[in-house]
Amino acid sequence: MKSAASSEDVVRVTEDLSECRNRLDAGIEENRRNRQVIQDINDQLQRFRQRANAESIESFNLTPSPDVTLSSLAHPGLTHLHNQTNISMPSLTIDIPLNSNAMISSSRTPNYAINGLRNRHKSLVGHRYRSTSPIGDYGRHRSSPRVLAHYNLDGADIGVGEENLDELFAKLKEELFKNNTLEEVNEMLREENDAALAANEHLRVDATNLSRQLQQLQQQQHTESMRFRSENTRYRNQTETQHRKLISLWKEFTAVKRQLHELRTTTANDLDRQLTEFTRCATLMRKAIRHAEQKNLDQKEQMKREKDDVLDETLRQLNSVTENYMKSEEKANERQRDLKRKEDECRKLREQNDELSDILEQLSKMAHEMAGGRGRNETPMDVARKMRKLLTTKNGEIDESREAAKQAEKERDRAKKDLEKEEKRRKDDREAERKRSSVYSQREHDLKKLDDELRKASEKIRNLEEQRESQEKLTISVQNSLNEAHRQHKQFIEELMIRHREELKEREDSHEEALRSKDTEERSRFEKERSEREKIRRESDELRETQRSLKGDVAAMKTDLDDKTLRLDMLETERDELKKKLETEREQADQRDLEIAECRAKLDEMAEKEAELRKELAEFQAIITAMEGEGKLNQEQFLESKNELNTLTDQIESLNSEVENKNEEIRNLMATLQEKEVHIQNVRTSSHQLTATYEEANGEIDILKAELTRLHEQVNERTRQISEANEKYDDAARKNDALLEDVATWQEKYEQLKMELEEMNRRGQEKEREEADLRALLDDLRGNFDKLTNELKQKGVTVDSLNEEISSLKEQLNKSEKERKEELLRMEELEQKNEAEMKEEYEVKLQLAEKDRQGVENFGKECEARMNELTKIHEMLMEEHDQLKVDHLHTEEEVERLKEKMRKELEKLNEQNDGDRAEWSNERNRLESSKNEAVTELQERVQKLEDVVKEKEDKEIALRRDLEDSHEKSRDLDDKLRKMELTDEEKEEDRKKEQKTLNEERMKLMEQKEEAMLVATKHATTIDQQTRRISVLEGDVEKLTAGIAERESSINALESNTMELISKLETTEAELEKLKDELAVMLKQNSELKNGKEGLSEKWNEERKKIQDLADQLREANKVVHNMRMKNVNLEEKKNELDQNVTDLTNKVRQLEIQLMDKAAKNEVSGDLLRKMEHDAQSMLKQAQNEQFRLTDLEKVRKALQDENQRLVNDLATVKAAFEVKRETSKSAISDILDKYRSAEEKANKGELDNQRLRSDLATVTLKLERQELKAKDSDNRLRDSQKRFEEVQSKLANLQKSAVESLQNPMSSNSRQNRSIYVDIPRAASSIGLNENSDEVPLRSSPSVRFADSSQNMQRAVDSMDVSSSVGVTLRFLKERIEQLEADNADLSDALEKAKDELRQRNEKLADRQMVIERVERQLVHITEERNTIENRMTSQRQMYLTNEESSRSREHEIRSMKARISTLELHLREKESKLAHLRKEIEVLHGQLHDALESKEKATGLVGVQDSKHRDLEEQLDRANRERELAIGKQRRTLAENENLFRKLEQLEKEREQLMREITDERRLNERNRTSLEELRVSERTWKSAMTTAKKPAEEQERAVQEQRRWEESNHEMTNRNTALTKECDRLRVEMRDQLNRMNGINLRSVDFERKNEELSSKLIVMQNTVTAMKKFEEEWKRLEAEMRAELKILRKEKLMQTAEIEDLKRKSFRSDTEKKEIEGIRVRLEREISALKRHVDALEEEKGKTEKAVRETMNERRAIDKSLASMERENQQLYRNCAQLQAQIQNLERDAGNRSVTKLAKEHSLLEARIAALIEEKRQLQSMLDQKDANYSHKRKLLESQIQLLREQLEAERRKRTKGVVATGPTVSRRGVQHTSAFRHTIERHRSLSQSSERTILQERYLEYVYTGDRTPAIQMINTPPISPLSHSGSFNSDGREARIRRESDNGHLQH
């Protein structure tokens, strides 16, 4: 109602405004008419004046001139008129200047002047708003007839004038009346405007109410969604209760089956005497047992396959999660960079504004200075011109600054939007975490389900055990019955059945022997398997321990990676760079030692070059001393060049200041990065804690496994079953691990789900395809499940202990989950704190931005333009929406076609899979034998590998000790480098220029690092996949690990080489800098002596050539670095080849021999690398011993690895055939199963991703709604501004009118009433208006004739100049146009409000639709997850059999992964080093450029030296002093050079001696090794000697000699080591001395440079005046440059504005699309509600079906009773048979007494009859067994039918959804036609399922329920039991269920009749 009232108010406002317009138009017309009237009056007045003038002239001519005193006495009223009188009328001013005599009442003139001033003051100041109306004072200065009497004494003319004046005043009164009416109209307009403002306020209140209603609707939607969720949970509970009831029915059925088994045992006991039949039964039982065993084997194989598939799928998911995590990190880093960049831009803009303000201040100062310094010759016009120029320039600058401020404001708005997006993203993150918690709850629920299923499985296992025990009892009873039958036959007919008994005995003995042999074989096999399992478990425990150690190594490697990333960041700063490089060098001390050797070689070369250069310096100095007399002119030129250099240094200092500012910014960024790294480290600590808990759980699991082994010893026959249970337990543990990993990865999955809305349709189509694939998979899995259930009936497993273990595991899981939740809460708190801090920072920034925003103008105009653009974009989006709808329809049709194709292909694939499974099951049995042999071999290999691992651990301990030594050495290097830092301080100024490039390169390096991390993760995922494929080839993997270790050594060698090259480059850079200093000195000397001789120029060219040679050397060094990099690339390529070989091992095992040859070649290459390392190690003094030990150890390892390679080659030859067969057979079946299961889980994951995307889209839509609300608020603000403007205009009008009225109504002073003359003070009035400025300069005239002439001229001039009526018209027109503009603005704003309200409504609808779609998708996801859980539960039961034979292989996989992770880390190291090399190359190039620039600048400076010769004569003495000091310094330098040369020579000698010593040491070590071998031989011989000494007592002199030789060799070795240590100390001491001398040289050079600087300062004092002039010129140039830069920046900002507008348009399009999707979601919500109602009906139907199933159960109970009756009759018959047997025995005894032959024949006949009767009983027994089996099958068939029925209903619901979606787009008749199609399709599906159900019921019910027919007359017929049909649509809501059931009953009756 309020919204309707507000719209009516808006309409009323528009109507009122139109009425106001009409009134204003009428007023304007009336004013026009008044103007015409006033013009006529003016014409008449002019005529009257002419007449009055003529008459006055005639009157003066007739009468004499009056005396002054008489005129004063006759006209006493004119005494106050000194000069002028004033008459002001509407559009009329009469100026009559009158010249009065000086004697006329001069006493009154001051009073009159005061009065005039007072009136003028009132007209100007007293009235606040001066009117521009043409109407003057009504009663003031009016020309009355009394005034006219002074002009004419006659009465006739005066009467005419009076009549004209009366008419004129009447018209003037009418004019005033009209003006008063206009004021009333304006007051009316004001009131209407107030009403409009009130209406706008009402509209604003309505808008707030609408927003509240919107919030209420959202809350209602939320409550509805919660209600739907509760209904879903209720529905799930109902289904679970139904499932439980079905399980209870199954239990009852099993109980009935047990009773039947008991009946079977009773019948078996009754038929104990029949020997032959029981033998047949025994054979049949044996066959059945064999068949069951075969089925068990097949089932185990299937379980293994499925378990492998599931494991592969989980690993694939982990890989995808890691990739998603890396992508999310990249996005977060990009966002952080964008924020930083925007902050930098804002800061730059502020700095620019500050600079502009400074420039403006400077300009103002310049203007003042120019004004102050201006001489007297300048005119004020010149000054004004200059000021105008300055003002124009300032205005231009102000405009530019305003534009820049606008751009800054836009950027600020952009930053605000980004902040809002960030806050929204964080809100989404919180929601995602909440959803994760819900997912965790669902997982807990799934775990509970798994527990229930385990309990059910345990119950089933117990039942199966009972059945098996009954079967064993049966077999025992059969054996007892056989024995008893033999005894009875011996008693009955010993004589007649001797042969028969012997044959039976032979058969029994053979059978028993076979059974015993089988039992013994099985027991032996079980014992072997038990021992093997124990070995495997031990190995697995050991491998797990190794795995833990490897995990620790992996963590250490990760920490190393983090340290190296920090090192990359440390390259940004200079001193921090060096310190952090030292930390890295401490970790890589071995590599640094290798680098020092090459550095020394380079130092020697550079020393030689230095000696040559110094010789040349000496020559140059000699030339300088010779040319000092000629160097005066050169010195003057030199001073000029120094002045220029000073200017350059000033510029450099400014640049350095800028660089320092940037460094400060970089430090701030580094601080933020460190905070983030701290946060990351906290996360890592939490992950480490989780791993620790995981390891504790594994320890407890190992304890439980030990208990299980103890239980295995007690139960010998069920070891295999317990192993399967252990596998289940391992799978549960792995699932728990996967859940823990998912906890870490799930937090970052949500960032992948922020995609565009356009992908929604495609995802929906993919979901439908996925559902079809899942259905096919479900059918296959159901078939497998049915097979498993039928086969599990024959098995039995005791799992009571497992239940206890599972309960303990649950407790552990609960504890771990609680800890995980606590950690999550901590993380949330930390994130909230960080968010609060960020918000505070951003709020401060926003406050600053808002302060800047206050100065911005013309914002309203831009908003209006934006609104117009938005309306246009809205229209475009509507058109695109229509097009998208049409495209959507086409895509749906194409999707349906694709579905049909996919279904056909799935059917074909299912058929192929069935065939492949059969073949694979046959070949699997054949491979098991070969696999067992391979397992034994692998166990032996594992033992050997464990020994190798122990050896490697010992080596690692030795390497760690070496690392500690290297750390100490690195500390020494730190001290040395600190000394080097003192020299580096001078280089900081040059490097500050390079920091810009370094920052850019750092950003590139960060990006490269992120890319490398992504590549590393991808490689890790590929490596994991490859390791899965190579799980069987453990021997090959071990071989590859050995190769990888060698590769690591080679990589370390390459890294050391790269570090050496880096150090060389650093030394070359230091040398280059030294050479730069020397070149600076030389250049100065050459600049002084350039004009002297040509020889100097030639030598200068030679020096340039030397510099070029040095540059060439640098290039060569770069080439060397490039070559090393290429070698690294080649190594990486070789590594990739290794990975390819690993993958080819699974497909091409035959090529392993060739690959092994390649690996041998690669090992030789690695051996060469090791030799190079040995050669490099010889150059080191301190670490010679450690490195030699390492080399010997590495050689041993290499030999061992070669031996292992050869052994593994031989092993591969044995394993090759088995794995080839296995690969070819298992490839197809496993790939098919993997693809299906992967596709199913991928589709489920995609569904979840789409759900989260929808949620993110909802969040974006809400953001857009908030933005539109802000826009609505902006529009309200605009309305307020327009209203304020309107009020101002109205106030102006009112003030104008008031001023006009006041000007008319202000009466004249009291003295005017006494005026009776025609003298008017016109000039004063003119001066009040602004006509006569020089009113005081009016001359005094002596005659009245002259006065009248002047008065007529002035009067005409005033009439021509003053046209006030035109100004009033202009103002009214302006007011009219302004009012029209305001009305148009008001109308536009009202339209915009209405549009905004419509958009709000539409978006609310879209939000509701989207929420419904999300709920639907969530339901689908829940359904998919339930199906997935069911599939996983089934698959877990199938996976457990597959993992028994592959536990050892999987434990090996972890080791391989760790090794490959190390490889990846090494690759990252290589890439980092490559990046460092590239960075150093760039720095060298920059240095070359700087050298070239410096040379050019110096050449230019030398050209300008000859200008100022005269100014440098006074400084010659100071130069002479400086030259003397320089000569002294040069002498000192020469001495130091000589000392350095001597030191270098000594070093060379020492190095030669060291090399000789190293050679001797190597020779001695070789001798030591030989001696050790000889000692070992001697020790062996000693043992033999000792044995011989006991017999022969020979002397042991040879032994003593060997001991003495050994001691001698040890002493010599100790002496050599001491010598080595002494030499190393001496070398260190010499190096320290050399460095000290170099420092001294550097100090001397610095002193010389300081003296030169002093000279330059002295010269600079003379050039100060010139610099001031040049500075002013530079200031002008800089000003121009700043203007150009500002303009360029303005252009850039305009471009950015265009880009932002384009982005806004894109966002608007997206918002429009989201609106359309919202509408679709609303429609889907309605459909889902309908579907919910349909599902409720379906639930009711299922309950009815449940009742029917209960009826069927009752009928089965009736059947059971009938079977019990039949069994009772059978028992009676058995009793009768016993009686007959007793009678027959009595008869036989009688007949034997009577007659032997007759009795024999009779007994034979009776025996045959008994056998026939026993056969009939056996057939009846078989029929009963078949009936029971048929009932089991019937129950499974019912279950399948129910599942198919549910599937049918789902398909029907999906079909109805599709058709309804199509029906929404289609028209009325199309809807009806589709409804018919829908009913036809539904009827077709019903008929199809009806036919299926009928066929199934015919085949099951008619074939399985058979009659019991006996051969004799006494066999009663058992009546058939008509079970009710089980149809897929037997509920009340189905179509024609009653008729179909009747039809099925008739057909079943017909089938019975046919039987």
Curated annotation (Swiss-Prot):
InterPro entries: Rootletin-like_CC. It is found in: Cytoplasm, Cytoskeleton, Cilium basal body; Cytoplasm, Cytoskeleton, Cilium axoneme. Keywords: Cell projection, Cilium, Cilium biogenesis/degradation, Coiled coil, Cytoplasm, Cytoskeleton. Residues 326-341, 396-451, 907-931, 961-982, 989-998 have a biased composition (Basic and acidic residues). Residues 321-341, 391-451, 504-551, 907-935, 961-998 are annotated as: Disordered. Disruption phenotype: Ciliary degeneration which is partly due to irregular localization of ciliary components. This likely leads to the impaired intraflagellar transport of proteins along the ciliary axoneme during the later stages of larval development. One of its GO terms (cellular component) is ciliary basal body. GO terms for biological process: cilium assembly. It comes from the Eukaryota. Residues 29-58, 162-223, 284-1303, 1368-1579, 1607-1863 form a coiled coil. Pfam families: Rootletin. Expressed in head ciliated neurons. Belongs to the rootletin family. Major structural component of the ciliary rootlet, a cytoskeletal-like structure in ciliated cells which originates from the basal body at the proximal end of a cilium and extends proximally toward the cell nucleus. Required for cilia integrity and function in sensory neurons. Maintains cilia integrity, partly by modulating the assembly and transport of intraflagellar proteins along the ciliary axoneme. Required for normal mating behavior and normal responses to environmental and chemical stimuli. This is Rootletin. It comes from Caenorhabditis elegans. The gene is che-10.
